[in-house]
């Protein structure tokens, strides 16, 4: 370790000396350790309390004809951060602490950032020049080195409802032609390991495909032609380009996240994904956002009993649901599809008096949420 640190220090003082090819860094509590290799292709491995979590995991990003992560690293920097972060919308507490150690690999037109937290590790690519080339491919791998039980939400389509049941099986027992929606959980000895992403903007979401004792990221290429689906206001890509996004630009890419937890309940308490995400509109006003429980008519298909009217998509049903929400201290009623025309939010269903429902709900102290498909608000 001293030899590694000497090489790192020497690289700062004498730029002509080759930077360290193996870098080690730990979490603030020293339980998580990452080992980064920069020779030929950048890769990393992880351990917690001496237990191997991830074996050697190579990573790269193909921009135009260049493959980032395979060229010569020019410089390595480190820093430690511990600062209070106030939640945009308060929950059980108003703020948390963003505490991590960071290693940064600096290249000619990009850099790779690694952050090591007490509850996980993440890395991302950062474009430092306004690169006009398309991003053609990203290679993401989570290699465990041996088989472990995994929790996956499997699908065989890049566009779907994400409503499948979870499959609990060893990685090697999963069908290799399927892939899972993130996050995926893997049990490594006594630890719960969560594979996920964070800060996803203007980039395809990551699916995770099982391979031998591993998961690999796969991504939907940029849509070429889009067509309506089944006559509904859903749009599907019928053909795709040969790239992920048309222009790289000067930007940050999504974080590739490995959460490492001592038990399942720790996952619920973790703010790792939140801390890795960035607020895009710094001056935006979020004070109007009020957290709360919601009564959603879709869950019970508007089946209510012992009433003197016909239940369904109508004003009386929603007034009844508002009364129920007020009585049981439920902050919101969500009115699902049917309150407007399918393809026009401004054409209201005459059987659902939205202004009357909203006025009544306000008097009862209940908020109204109106469901819409994304194509109607773009």
Label every PLM stretch briefly:
Residues 1-22:
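Bacterial Sec-dependent N-terminal signal peptides
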Residues 6, 16, 108, 119, ...:
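Short, solvent-exposed loop/edge-beta patches enriched in aromatic
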Residues 10-11, 185, 364:
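Charged interaction patches that mediate protein-protein contacts
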Residues 14-17, 28, 363:
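Compositionally biased regions
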Residues 22-281:
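N-terminal accessory beta-strand-rich subdomains and adjacent acidic, glycine-rich linkers
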Residues 279-289:
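Short, cationic low-complexity segments
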Residues 288-378:
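Substrate-binding cleft of carbohydrate-active enzyme catalytic domains
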């Amino acid at each position: 370790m001293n030899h590694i640190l000497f090489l790192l220090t020497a690289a700062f003082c004498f730029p002509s000396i080759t930077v360290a090819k193996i870098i080690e860094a730990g979490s603030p509590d020293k339980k998580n350790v990452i080992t980064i290799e920069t020779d030929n292709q950048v890769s990393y491995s992880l351990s917690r309390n001496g237990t191997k979590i991830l074996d050697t995991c190579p990573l790269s990003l193909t921009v135009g004809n260049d493959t980032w992560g395979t060229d010569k690293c020019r410089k390595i920097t480190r820093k430690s951060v511990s600062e209070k972060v106030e939640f945009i919308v308060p929950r059980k507490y108003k703020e948390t602490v963003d505490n991590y150690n960071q290693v940064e690999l600096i290249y000619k037109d990009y850099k790779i950032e690694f952050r090591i937290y007490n509850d996980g590790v993440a890395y991302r690519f950062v474009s430092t020049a306004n690169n006009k080339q398309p991003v053609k491919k990203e290679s993401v791998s989570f290699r465990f080195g041996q088989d472990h039980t995994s929790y996956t939400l499997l699908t065989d389509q890049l566009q779907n409802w994400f409503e499948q049941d979870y499959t609990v099986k060893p990685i090697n027992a999963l069908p290799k032609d399927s892939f899972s929606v993130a996050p995926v959980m893997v049990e490594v000895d006594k630890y719960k390991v969560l594979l996920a992403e964070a800060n996803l903007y203007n980039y395809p979401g990551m699916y995770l495909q099982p391979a031998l004792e591993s998961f690999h990221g796969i991504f939907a290429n940029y849509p070429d032609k889009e067509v309506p689906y089944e006559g509904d206001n859903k749009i599907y890509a019928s053909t795709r380009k040969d790239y992920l996004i048309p222009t790289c630009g000067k930007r940050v890419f999504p974080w590739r996240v490995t959460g490492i937890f001592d038990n399942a309940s720790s996952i619920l308490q973790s703010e790792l994904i939140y801390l890795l995400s960035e607020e895009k509109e710094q001056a935006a006003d979020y004070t109007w956002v009020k957290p709360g429980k919601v009564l959603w008519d879709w869950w019970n298909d508007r089946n209510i009993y012992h009433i003197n009217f016909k239940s369904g998509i109508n004003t009386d049903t929603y007034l009844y649901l508002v009364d129920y929400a007020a009585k049981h201290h439920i902050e919101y009623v969500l009115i699902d599809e049917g309150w407007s025309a399918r393809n026009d939010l401004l054409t209201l269903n005459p059987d659902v008096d939205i202004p009357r429902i909203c006025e009544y709900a306000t008097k009862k102290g209940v908020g109204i949420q109106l469901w819409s498909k994304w194509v109607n608000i773009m």
